[in-house]
Regions:
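Primarily recognizes the serine-hydrolase "nucleophile elbow" in alpha/beta-hydrolase
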Residues: 154-215, 233
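Short beta-strand element of the alpha/beta-hydrolase
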Residues: 99-107
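Catalytic nucleophile-loop/oxyanion-hole region of alpha/beta-hydrolase
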Residues: 113-122, 134-170, 295-302
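N-terminal cap/lid segment of alpha/beta-hydrolase-fold proteins
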Residues: 53-96
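Conserved alpha/beta-hydrolase "acid-adjacent" motif
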Residues: 258-264
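Short beta-strand/loop motif that positions the catalytic acidic residue
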Residues: 251-253
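Mobile cap/lid helix-loop segments that gate and shape the active-site cleft of serine hydrolases
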Residues: 76, 204-241, 247
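Single conserved hydrophobic/aromatic residue that forms the stacking wall/gate
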Residues: 1-15
């Protein structure tokens, strides 16, 4: 019963509930041997890779830029989290740690945190690869575009301060959609201990320039607003701030993405090349937007994406 208080991630809370229900089976009678065999099989099939998960607040003494959101935080039936005002990291430790950490940053167009694909796909994938995962539940902007970025920069600092505790030596950032934008901005706006060692940008909303943004995307309006001057578009277009210190990046996007588009990823890649920084861009012919790891009906190129990402991550020291 103390699992919830230890901050176990959503993916594994469901496992715990499942185990609690299984353990209610009456094994006291000898003819229940088949149930015992079934239980053992179920336990062996579960990806029990978590140890000592916890939740870490980003600003235990109060954030420097206060959110204007007053509504309570809520989660819908798809796992999307709304009205986030309490920035935090949720930690999951793999069964076979590789000494590397990754901060996972969900999307949601800066209007919510879309956790569905992360819970079902990205978190289990990185744990299986041996990464200690720190899921960033960042505060939503609602009129102040600096709020999410301050949370992500602080998150990198916090993870670095935990290297000894978790036996880590490297930390990267991974984001999808709006989370990809935030991961990219973290990579180009960081300094010192707030700088990640690498970035993984999945169908990222790289640009906030009006003429370069996808019409279907809500990122720009939710982050910057409709009426702000062009200086904000420039300030929050990540590719415009790439320099010779920007960390290595892996980018993946679908050619027909209607929400993030492939242009921003190409512009970021060009900026990395111009600054002689390591970069790997993968544009897939299928998938549109919102896919996860592995082949699916929505994303037939999913296995290729998984292989490309896995190979790239193996080169991270």
């Amino acid at each position: 019963d103390d699992v919830e208080s230890r901050g176990l991630g959503d993916v594994y809370k469901r496992q715990v509930i499942f185990l609690k229900n299984i353990l209610l089976i009456d094994f006291s009678r000898s003819h229940d041997m088949n149930k015992k065999v079934l239980l053992c099989s179920l336990l062996l099939s579960l990806p029990l890779v978590v140890s000592a998960a916890e939740t870490i607040p980003l600003w235990p003494n109060g954030a420097p830029n206060k959110s204007t959101i007053t509504e309570p935080e809520t989660t819908n039936d798809k796992g999307a989290i709304f009205n986030v005002t309490n920035g935090r990291l949720e930690v999951n430790v793999p069964k076979n740690p590789n000494g590397k950490a990754i901060i996972l940053i969900p999307g949601g167009g800066y209007g919510n945190l879309a956790m569905g694909t992360f819970n079902q796909s990205f978190i289990p994938y990185f744990l299986d690869q041996g990464f200690t995962t720190f899921v960033l539940k960042y505060r939503l902007p609602k009129g102040d575009p600096a709020i999410p970025l301050s949370d992500s920069l602080e998150a990198v600092k916090i993870v670095r301060s935990l290297f000894k505790k978790y036996n880590l030596h490297t930390v990267g950032v991974m984001g999808a959609s709006a989370g990809g934008h935030l991961a990219a901005m973290t990579s180009v706006e960081c300094s010192g201990d707030s700088c990640p060692d690498f970035s993984v940008l999945i169908y990222p909303n790289i640009t906030m320039m009006q003429e370069e943004s996808q019409p279907k995307s809500s990122c720009r309006n939710n982050l910057i607003g409709k009426d702000r001057s062009v200086k904000y578009d420039v300030a929050y277009s990540a590719y415009k701030h790439v320099d010779t210190k920007t960390p290595p990046a892996f980018l993946a996007v679908s050619a027909g993405d209607e929400y993030a588009g492939s242009l921003g990823s190409m512009l970021y890649t060009r900026a990395m090349v111009e600054n002689a920084r390591p970069v790997s861009l993968h544009v897939y012919p299928t998938g549109n937007h919102g896919w996860g790891i592995g082949k699916s009906e929505k994303f037939p190129d999913g296995d290729k994406f998984k292989d490309d990402l896995t190979a790239w991550l193996k080169d991270i020291k």
